[in-house]
Amino acid sequence: IDVFYTHCDALLTTDTWDIYFQKLPQGIQTQIMRFKRWQDRHASLLGKILLLEGLKKYGYPPDCLKNLSYSPYNRPFLDDSIDFNISHSGEYVVCAINNEGRVGIDIERMRPLDFSEFRNYMTSEEWNMMHESPDQLEYFYELWTVKESVIKGEGKGLSIPLLDIHWEGETASVSNNLWYIRKILIDPGYSCHVAANHEISELHTHKV
């Protein structure tokens, strides 16, 4: 598995935007421009550029994204030999690529929040473990990004309740499917996890 990530905390210059934008097929360009906020447009653009750069490492041509298809749950895919997933939060965009099976990735900036708003998304055991943790905020975001990475790997959208995902150490399970979990260290203010439906023998991170 390869994880590509980039940091973006300001508007891209017009020239840089145009260079990246022109690398993408018209359909993806249209998707990007539907976003109202510049932050969302940038995150969408950079996610696709990370994907494109990553796919090139696997031997795909520069115009390969024109062949993107979408599952019934609107999850993009290219072919059966490769899987990928993109996530963004705050100032980071991440993209995981896997040529051995399914993959999901999630990153979240660890902002202070009211835990009670998420009580219904956590089991009693998870809730108690969080309150017993020396760093409740970190535990919450670890749990959240693990579950989100599994959901994204499953590729069935919001049809999988967070309560149905059971995380234990380096694995998580949902609907009799076992997922292997790996924590990605990108920034101390963020939580990021990758999930794969097979044992993760190798994982490489690349800053772009």
What is each PLM-predicted segment?
Residues 1-208:
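Core catalytic alpha/beta fold that binds nucleotide/phospho-ligands
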